[in-house]
Amino acid sequence: MAKVPIAFLKFVIVLILFIAMSGMIEACIGNGGRCNENVGPPYCCSGFCLRQPNQGYGVCRNR
């Protein structure tokens, strides 16, 4: 069995983590989109969902 260099294994691990994180980043709601902080993913890209007390949904905004 051939030996695999450690540097190559590190590269593969970083590549897998990068691909996984890029999928999570794309799965967010942009500013101005409808959101619901009680439901779960997808979340606002900004991390903030502004919901008025009389509405069932919120709007993604910057803090």
From Swiss-Prot:
It comes from the Eukaryota. One of its GO terms (cellular component) is extracellular region. InterPro entries: Antimicrobial_C6_CS (IPR013006), Gurmarin/antifun_pep (IPR009101), Gurmarin/antimicrobial_peptd (IPR024206). SUPFAM superfamilies: Gurmarin-like. Residues 1-27 form the signal peptide. It is found in: Secreted. Disulfide bonds join C28-C45, C35-C49, C44-C60. Belongs to the AMP family. Possesses antifungal activity and is also active on two tested Gram-positive bacteria but is non-toxic for Gram-negative bacteria and cultured human cells. This is Antimicrobial peptide 2. It comes from Mirabilis jalapa. The gene is AMP2.
